[in-house]
Amino acid sequence: KYHLRYFVAFGTLLGTVRHKGFIPWDDDIDVGMPREDYERFLQIAQKECGEEYFLQTVDTDPEYHLYFAKLRMNRTRFVENSLQKSGSITGFYIDIFPYDEISDDEAEMEKQLNRAVRWGMILSIYKVKEPQIGQYGPAKDFVMRSIWHILHGGMHLCGISAGMVWKKCNQAFMKKPEKGSSRITTFAADAKKWIIEKKEIEQLVDVPFENITVKIPCGYDAILT
């Protein structure tokens, strides 16, 4: 309807190519969008969701802390471990990831990746009062949780707003590489692992997925290799 470019990604792409549907260990649907299409989608979806769906972002859900959007089905319940203590809105969902340019230059690329990780962590600390920490042993878990609480409380006491943090995150993730780019990735996931060539999404191919048709990149072989 709106001619937005999208493609299934990650485990959903693998399942589409190999099984024409879900793979047993993947319990969601992952969709990628070039940044310009993603931003248009966020605007359009606000008007199109109606009462059946909810577009979950940092802007629409004060308790949500992830950098990508979720399109949730209202009147359903599905609670992820990462969100169970956040008070965030639940429901069955599709993950929608923005893809941004990443530098062809190795040194600049590493700077982009480090900046994305840093600001993603800052966003999480600001948004999440009770972190999911429990894998390092009682003593270290206690120290890490205490540091998290101090940083979380400190940012709020200093009058830092969610809008300020979100703006800085967006600037970090969307900053254009200075040394040129023929590639894109999503900084909302394992960015280095999911780098793809722009040419791989120049043509999107319609393929069956369960009982619907979805789009995959023409370069899906290279992406999955």
Model-predicted segments: where are they?
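Charge-rich, low-complexity amphipathic helices
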Residues: 20-22, 35, 63, 67, ...
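Conserved catalytic core of two-metal-ion nucleotidyltransferases
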Residues: 1-2, 42-104, 123-223
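Active-site nucleotide-donor binding segment shared across nucleotidyl transfer reactions
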Residues: 2-29, 33-39, 199
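A short secondary-structure junction signal
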Residues: 106-111
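Short, His- and charge-rich active-site/binding loops that engage polyanionic ligands
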Residues: 113-117
